[in-house]
């Protein structure tokens, strides 16, 4: 049976290198938002939005980003329901993480992203008044919001 490199957030902390960058992923239905953090794991920055294509294409794009940015760990948003239960979206994110872990060897963790889309929307709306620009930035801003939550936790 395949052993996945998916860890709890506390296990993740012990499996990532100090002074390394992380990749935040917000796996949506149509798009996948990406964000990265600095080597000190203090600030997350929106990176880009990938179209949800064939999984092989996504893996190739994500591997390229990992290589170019010297990424040493991945934080994937887990859309847990407000009551703490896992729904369809959470199961989809878990499946995405498992499939990703079969193709990528760096540590992966899932991070509770409750309210990240709402927070991302408010942040994007404040920063950009152009509606079409907001739509394009929402997914990568959500990934940055998710990653920031995780790195804030990791720094404590």
Predicted regions and their residues:
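Phosphate- and other anionic-substrate recognition elements at nucleic-acid/protein interfaces
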Residues: 2-23, 30, 35-156
């Amino acid at each position: 049976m395949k052993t996945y490199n998916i860890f709890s957030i506390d296990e993740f902390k012990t499996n990532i290198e100090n002074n390394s960058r992380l990749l935040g992923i917000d796996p949506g239905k149509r798009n996948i938002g990406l964000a990265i953090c600095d080597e000190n794991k203090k600030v997350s920055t929106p990176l880009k939005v990938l179209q949800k294509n064939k999984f092989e294409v996504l893996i190739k794009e994500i591997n390229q980003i990992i290589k170019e940015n010297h990424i040493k760990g991945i934080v994937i948003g887990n859309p847990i329901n407000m009551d703490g239960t896992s729904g369809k979206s959470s199961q989809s994110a878990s499946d995405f993480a498992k499939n990703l872990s079969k193709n990528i060897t760096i540590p992966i963790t899932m991070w509770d992203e409750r309210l990240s889309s709402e927070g991302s929307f408010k942040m994007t709306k404040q920063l950009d008044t152009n509606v079409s620009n907001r739509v394009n930035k929402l997914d990568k801003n959500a990934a940055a919001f998710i990653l920031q939550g995780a790195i804030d936790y990791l720094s404590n």
